[in-house]
Amino acid sequence: MRVRLLSAFVMLVLASTLSFAQTGADEQPPVDVFAGFSHSSNFSTGLNGWIIAGNYSVNNSWLGVEGEISGHYGSQNLSALPILIPGAPSSVDNSLHNFDFGPRVTWRSPDYPVNAFGHLLFGASHAKISAAGISDTDTAFSWVLGGGADYNFNERWAGRAQLDLLHTNFFSNGESHPRISLGLVYRLGTPE
């Protein structure tokens, strides 16, 4: 079954590459929307979640304006704590939501179906930590520095891999969180 899925994926990528070769890299629509899976670390816990982002390329150039929203969720197991302290919680639930926007620089390869980009985004992040019915929340300034690459299947669709460093200041404590995201890009508008 895995071999069939992998074979189908390889055929799709090869067919998409051939169809992309018929359109130039500078002929892409100016708006792209990205949605996908995202993994981040937070408070020494791995968090899984989602990410949605949009970018508008000014005059279909290398410069764009990007906004993104993401949510990450997870639990930290404290299995030894209830043994040491009876009645203590056995896990801590974490959630992290980000709302950021800022400039994005994109390089479109003239020879390959690949776009590489970098961005520096600013905004706010919201964290919630809860255990045994008690919770605490904080909203703080955040910034995101990172980038990624799109593999263009055709003029409208692409697959994206993205790696970011998310910096937050929750509970008066500055922390940097690595974040990796994988998903699909859909492009809107008419190429300029």
Report residues per predicted region.
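Transmembrane beta-barrel strands of outer-membrane/channel proteins
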Residues: 33-39, 67-71, 118-124, 147-149, ...
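Gram-negative (and chloroplast) outer-membrane scaffold detector with strong preference
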Residues: 55-132, 140, 181-188
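Bacterial N-terminal signal peptides
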Residues: 7-17
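Residues that define the transmembrane beta-barrel architecture of outer-membrane proteins
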Residues: 29, 46-50, 93-99, 114, ...
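Short glycine/proline- and aromatic-enriched beta-strand/turn motifs that initiate or cap beta-hairpins
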Residues: 21-59, 122, 181, 185-192
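Outer-membrane beta-barrel domain signature
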Residues: 22-24, 39-45, 88-94, 132-137, ...
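Predominantly the C-terminal beta-signal and adjacent terminal strand-loop region
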Residues: 77-78, 151-192
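Membrane-spanning beta-strand positions in outer-membrane beta-barrel proteins
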Residues: 32, 62-64, 115, 152, ...
